[in-house]
A protein has these predicted regions:
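Helix-turn-helix DNA-binding segment
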Residues: 124-175, 179-184, 188
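Amphipathic alpha-helical segments of tetratricopeptide repeats
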Residues: 2, 32-39, 72-82
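Residue signature of alpha-solenoid helical repeat architecture, marking inter-repeat boundaries
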Residues: 5, 44-45
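Intrinsically disordered or compositionally simple regulatory linkers and C-terminal tails
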Residues: 104-135
Length: 189
C-alpha cells in the first residue's frame, strides 16, 4: 500500500484522468472526497487536487466552487512558494488565474506565467509529435484562456464577466487568437 501522501497524489492522477475523459462531476467528487478524508493534510497533493477541482468546476461553469478551490490551492502554495503547479495547469484552469491571482498578486502572476511558457514549450515537444496534432505556441496566455472558454461554449459576456474585462476586449482576444491559429469560425477553436 502506498503511504497516505502518495495515495492522495494518486487520487489527483485519477481525478485528472476523469477530467480528460470529460467526466467532470465524478472527478470533482473524487477530489472533494479525497480532501475530506485526509488528503488536505498533505500540502502538495492537496494543492494538485484543488487545481483539478478548479478544472472540473470551470468545465461545469460553477465558477464560485472553482474560485474557492483556486484560493485554497493558492493558500497552500504561498508559504513555501509552491507555484509550479499553477503554471503547469494554466491552460486548464479556465482563466481563473487571470481572474483571481493577477489582480491580487500581480508579481506572483507574472512568475506563474513564466513557468507556464517554460512548461508549455516542453509539453508541446512531447505532445505534438505523439498525437500528430499541433498545439498553438504563439498565443498569449490570456488569448489561450479566452479561447479555451469560448471552445467550451462560454459566451463573450460570460467570459468578460469571469475575467472582469469588457465583451469588446474578449472579442479582441478571440480575433487575435483566431488570426494566429488561421481559423475563421469560433467553433473551430
Amino acid at each position: 500500500l502506498l503511504p497516505q501522501g502518495l495515495r492522495a497524489f494518486a487520487l489527483y492522477i485519477q481525478a485528472h484522468y476523469l477530467y480528460l475523459k470529460g467526466e467532470y462531476g465524478p472527478s470533482a467528487g473524487l477530489v472533494e472526497g479525497a480532501l475530506s478524508m485526509g488528503a488536505a493534510a498533505y500540502p502538495i497533493p492537496a494543492l494538485y487536487l484543488h487545481l483539478v477541482a478548479v478544472m472540473d468546476y470551470m468545465s461545469l461553469k460553477q465558477t464560485e466552487k472553482a474560485r474557492a478551490h483556486l484560493l485554497a490551492a493558492w493558500a497552500l502554495a504561498q508559504p513555501d512558494d509552491l507555484i509550479e503547479g499553477f503554471g503547469e495547469h494554466h491552460g486548464l484552469l479556465g482563466g481563473m488565474l487571470e481572474a483571481e491571482i493577477k489582480p491580487a498578486w500581480p508579481e506572483d502572476f507574472k512568475r506563474v506565467i513564466a513557468i507556464t511558457y517554460r512548461f508549455s514549450a516542453g509539453w508541446r515537444k512531447v505532445h505534438n509529435p505523439e498525437t500528430g496534432h499541433d498545439v498553438a505556441d504563439d498565443l498569449t496566455t490570456t488569448e489561450f484562456a479566452v479561447s479555451m472558454l469560448a471552445a467550451r461554449g462560454w459566451t463573450n459576456q460570460e467570459i468578460a464577466a469571469h475575467l472582469r474585462i469588457s465583451p469588446n476586449t474578449v472579442k479582441r482576444y478571440l480575433s487575435a487568437a483566431m488570426e494566429k491559429l488561421h481559423i475563421s469560425h469560433r467553433q473551430d477553436l
